[in-house]
Amino acid sequence: MNDLSSVLLEGVLAEDPKTSTSPDGQARCNFIVTTVEGRKKEPFHFGVVAYGQLGQKCLYDLKAGRGVRVVGRLRRESSTDPEGEYHPEIKIVAEHVEFRPLKSERGE
């Protein structure tokens, strides 16, 4: 059986994207997409990472509050905090990102 970890996510950028370097030296763009679901309109936050030219485009074009659609795959990451505590995390590795127009770009 093949495992499938494809993701399609639509939401709004929670904050401006940040750039970092992966352990293997690759430049990457990290951002958080917020979606609102359910009757209670509870927000969910998803970490997304984009590499290469896509990452550069995201860093340049994305701003907090902008709508995005991300197509990607799931990847498990982990980190250790200064106290030595292990923190597992699931991130979305972006393979395609669509940028929604900002209100100012739509003439609103």
Residue ranges of each PLM-predicted region?
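Single-stranded nucleic acid-binding surfaces, predominantly the OB-fold ssDNA-binding core
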Residues: 1-108
